[in-house]
Amino acid sequence: MEELLTKYPDIKVKAKARNLSKKEEAQEFGHWLLNNAYNIDVLVNNAGNFIPGSIYNEAEGALEAMIQTNLYSAYHLTRVLLPAMMKRKSGHIFNMCSIASLQAYNNGGAYSISKFALNGFSSNLRQELKPYNIKVTTVFPGAAYTDSWSESGIDPKRIMEAGDIAAMIYAASQLSPQACVEEIVLRPQLGDL
């Protein structure tokens, strides 16, 4: 946050740390936003968790942990914020899925299952919210360089920059009210890892 305030000294930034994998904290965060008189124009559901493993041998509780973070966080936060968006008949929701939402891969067991579920949530939400002029975009990024890759040995130039994904979300959010990018698929130029 310090970096944002330094880079953009004229903006007002408020932050509230919450563990969105917990239903009560996700709901409380949504109410905090609404109680601070924020009109949510764009919601990016980006809470995520990855625990590698195969379905047959991953740690006990891995599926539950990833469903809690990767699906339920978006579900519970969105449900709190939707009534105000529906009343205004405007808004744009971005759900951060993954290439793992579209195809299975080795060592992706529970993670892939949770992201497939988030894709289903996103598709249903898009259908339900059309009458309210609320757009829903599902984002399917491949590998993007974040801190979690810093000790992986992977050359940062081999995978996407996180800013590439942010730029696509911003671009999609700037379209006219009549246009909705339903899905964004982004992959490293050299292909998936």
Predicted features, each with a name:
Residues 46-51:
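Conserved NAD(P)H cofactor-binding loop of Rossmann-fold oxidoreductase domains
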Residues 54-55, 62-67:
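Substrate-binding pocket helix/loop in short-chain dehydrogenase/reductase
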Residues 78, 114:
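Active-site helix of classical SDR
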Residues 98:
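Residue(s) in the substrate-gating loop at a strand-loop-helix junction
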